[in-house]
Amino acid sequence: MQTHEIRQRFIEHFTKAGHTEVPSASLILDDPNLLFVNAGMVPFKPYFLGQQNPPFENGTATSIQKCVRTLDIDEVGITTRHNTFFQMAGNFSFGAYFKEGAITHAWTLLTNPVEEGGLGLDPERLWVTVFTDDDEAAEIWNKKIGVPEHKIQRLGMEDNYWSMGIPGPCGPCSEIYYDRGPEHGQEGGPIVDDTRYIEIWNLVFMENERGEGLGKGNFEIVGKLPKKNIDTGLGIERVACILQDVDNVYETDLLRPVIDVAQEVTGAKYGADQANDVRFRVIADHSRTGLMLMLDGVTPGNEGRGYILRRLLRRIIRSARLLGATGETLEKFMDTVRETMTPSYPEIAENYERIRAVALAEEKSFLKTLESGSQMFDNWAHEAKERGEDTVPGDVAFSLHDTHGFPIDLTQEMAAEADLKVDIDGFHELMAEQKARAKADNNAKKLGHVDQTIYRPFVDNHPTVFTGYENLADEASVLGIIRDGALVETAPEGAAAQVILDRTPFYAEAGGQMADRGEMTSTSGAARVEDVQKVGKKVWVHHVTVSGGELAVGQKVQATVDKAWRHQARQAHSGTHLIHAALREVLGPTAVQAGSMNKPGYLRFDFNYGEQLTEHQLNQIEEIANGAVDSDYQVNTIETSLEEAKAMGAMALFGENYGSEVRVVEIGGPFSMELCGGIHVEHSSQVGPISVLGESSVGSGVRRIEAYTGMDSFRFLSTEKSLVSGLATSLKTPSEELPDRIDALTAKLKAAEKQIQQLRAQQLQGQVGQLVEKAETIGEVKVLAEQLPEGVAAGDLRTLAMDAKNRLGSEPAVVVFASVDGEKVPFVAAANDAAVDKGIKAGELVKTFGEKVAGRGGGKPAMAQGSGSDAAGISAGIEAVKSALRG
C-alpha cells in the first residue's frame, strides 16, 4: 500500500466517524520558542490549554501534520530509525469521547480488512502498553477489544504518561506496537525489545493537570481538567514500512527513490559499504526535509530555522561529493522528492520553482568553498595526527565557518569521521568575540565612539524614566553631560554633547524606529536634540547641539519632542505593522520579519521569502494595508506577560529575547497583533495613505519592501501624477493608453536598432575580404588580429571571425577581433582545425588578450570570447596575442 493511500484511509476513517478534517499547519508557527512544529497536537494546543474553544463540529477533529525534529540530525543515516521530517496522523476529541472511543477507533482502523477501508494489520501481531495504574484502559483492551492479557504491558510515568513538559494538561497514554517477527529480535513484547516491536500509535488520555517539575515523570498531578480530551498520534512512515513489508523508512516509496537517484548521480552502490550507506540515507532524509521546509518559506541563513535548513542542504551536498558526485546534484534529489511528496502535498507543484531556485542558489554558494574548506581541514587533520593531537582547535573551526561557510555541526561531523574532537568552547568564544566586536562597533558609531564605561554609573544607579508614551514634553533634571568622551559640568553654545536626564519624553532608537528629534531648554540655555540612543537598555543618551547659552549638570530643563517629527514617525511605524500583516495575508505565515527601519514618512521592511514578488502581489499588499487605514481600526497597547501575549496570538520574532513582561500593539483586533515597544498612532486612519515603492533582494532568502506614509506618500503620488501627465502631453496620448504607446515605441526602437546592427554587420562582412588581406604569417600560422570599428557587438564579432577564418583557407589560421561597444570591450578568437591540431587554443588567446583590457574570457580551442573594460589596451592585447603565437 502506497503511503498516500495510507494517509487517505486514515482521514476517511475519521471523517466518516464525524471528525472535522483539519489541513496540516505550516511547519512554522508564531511561537518564538518553537523552532518547528514537532508533534501532531501542536496546532491544537490552544484548545487543550483552554485558551480557545474548539471550532469543530461534534468536538472532534483529525489531521495529518507535517513535523520536523532536529535534535537527532547527527543520528540520521547512522541508524535507520531517525528521520528529521515525518508525518503524524492524529484524531482529537475535546470532551466528545474518551478512552473506549479512542481505543476502538484505533483498533478498527488498524485491523479492519483493506476492502472495508482498514489497514489490514494482523491482530495477532499487535501489542499494547498502558500506564501502570490505568486499569480502565487495560480492561478496555482486554474485555472490549479482545487483546490477550499477556500482550497488554504496563509501564511507568517515564514511558506511558504524557505532558507538554510544563504545567498544564497531562494524562496517561496507551501505545500500540507491531511485532515484526522473530528475525528482528527476541520475544516478549515492547518492554523486552523495541527493535522487534515498533510503536505505531500513541493514544493520550488527557484528563489531569500537572504541576512544576523536571523530566518526563518527575512532576505532581495537581488537579483534574474540566473536560476529558483525546490526543493521538500515528506515525505514517512507520505504518508504511509495515504495509510495504520493508525493514525501514528508507526502503519505502517516499525515500527509496531518492536513494536510487543518488546511486545514478554518484556511481556508488547502496548496500555495499556502511559509511556510504549513511551518506545515501542523509541525502534521502535531508532532501525531503529541506524541500518541505522551503515549501513553508524557510530560506538558508546563519541563525534559527535558516541555519537548520542550511545545515541540511550542505550535508546533502557534502555527502553526494563523498559518494563521488561532481557538479550540482541538489536539483535531481529535489525533483525526486517532488514526485514522491506531491500526491500528498499538491501545493509543492505551484511552489516548486521557488524551492528549486533557493536550493540551487545555496548549492552554488557552498560549492565555491566546499573544496577549499575540505582541503584545509584534511591538511590540518593530517598534520595534527602526525603531531599526536586529537582536537580541532576553536580557531580552525572558526575559520572554516567564517571563511568557508562550514556550519560548526559539519566541522564536528568531519572531525568525528577523522576520529577527532572539536574545541567547541573555543569556537563559541571566537564567535562571541566577533559578535561583540560588531555590536561594540555599531554602538560606538551610535554613541560617537565614546568609551561606554563612562555610562556605567548612570546604568547602575540612575536609569532613565521614559514618559514618551503619554507625553511630548516633560520637565527633567540634567544628570550628566559628556563632551569629547569626558564627563563635564557644562556645555556652552555651539558645543556638541551627550546629555543624560532623569526622565525623558524622547523615544530612543529601537525596534527599527528612528529616535525622536526636538529641543531641551533651561533658564540658561537651549539645545537641539538630534539623536537619542540607549545604553544598557536603561539610560537614554541625548545627542544635542547647544543652540544658545549653556546647559549645566543639575539644572532643570524642559524636554520637548518635535510634534511633527513624532507624528510622521508614528505613521511610519504603524504603517510597518500594517505592511507586515498584509504581507503575511498575501504570502503566507512564513513571510516573517527579518528587520525594519522607519523614520518620518518612510519605512522599509525586510522579510524572509525566497523569490521576487510579482507586481500583482505588491499591489495586493498595498491595497490590503490601505484597506486597514480606511477601516480606521483602533490601535491598542497592552502590557502583559509573555505567555499571555502568546496566548492572545501576538506575533513574536523567533530568536528574539523577550522579558517576562512585554508590550503588545494591536491594530484592529486580529488584523495585526505584535510584540512592540515603539510609538504608534491611535487609529489606523492616522497613518494616511501608504505608497509601496517596490521590493528588492537584500541577501539570500531575504526581500525588502519600501513605502511612504502620510504626506510623503501624498507627495510621491503627486510627483507620479505629474510624471504621467507630462508623458501624456509629450506623446500626445491619453494617460490610460500610455503603456500601449510606450510598448509600441519601444518595439519600434528595438526594430530600428536591430536593422542598424544588421546593416553594420553587412557592411563589415563586405569588408572581411579586405581584412583577410591584412593577415600576416607567424611561424606556420596565418594570423589576422585587428580592432574593428566602434559599436560591433559580441555576437557580430563572433560571426565575422568565423567568416574570416573560413576565408583564410585550410592552412593553420587564427583570427582575433576586438571592438569598443559602449563601455565594454568585446573580443573574440577563432582557430581553424589545422591550427588546433598544432596545439593552438582560442581560449588561451582570449585570456592573453583579456589581461591587457581589464577583462576575462574563455571557450573552446576552436572558438572563444570575452569582455573587458579598458579600450586603451586593445593594441597591447593584439601584440600580446602575436607574441604568444611567436612562442
Swiss-Prot record:
Annotated GO biological process: alanyl-tRNA aminoacylation
The reaction(s) this protein catalyses: tRNA(Ala) + L-alanine + ATP = L-alanyl-tRNA(Ala) + AMP + diphosphate
Residues that coordinate or bind Zn(2+): H573, H577, C676, H680
Manner of cofactor binding, per the entry note: Binds 1 zinc ion per subunit.
Superkingdom, natural source: Bacteria
Keyword flag ATP-binding: yes
UniProt-recorded name of the protein: Alanine--tRNA ligase
Organism: Corynebacterium jeikeium (strain K411)
